[in-house]
Amino acid sequence: VPVTDENQTSGWVSTETIVDAPYRNTTEDQLRAQFAREWRTGATLETYILASQANKVLNGRYLDERLTCSILLGSRFEGGPVMGQFYTNGFLLVSALLAPGGHTRSLGGRSEGGR
């Protein structure tokens, strides 16, 4: 089963460039509410990969490099959002978010878009 995107983004896209995941210790529902307040949507896996590669070139580190993971509400696998994390060697770990109500200090979320 492939990963599918909820958002179809084209052109310029803004996203967070902070290395450690923003919005940590929030649930899937809390992330959706936060992004809606900011006129943003959950980042897709494609946006996450592109932003992380750009961050590596510009700042020397991948997004979520080893210490945090990001929920990517814009991409889904078997009905639920996916999580992403990069390692220092550029390896990308993508997994399904198992519990929508789950939250930890090392798990955050990333958004895209903007006003």
Regions flagged by a language model, labelled:
Residues 1-41, 45-115:
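A binding-site-centric feature that preferentially detects glycan-recognition modules on secreted/surface proteins
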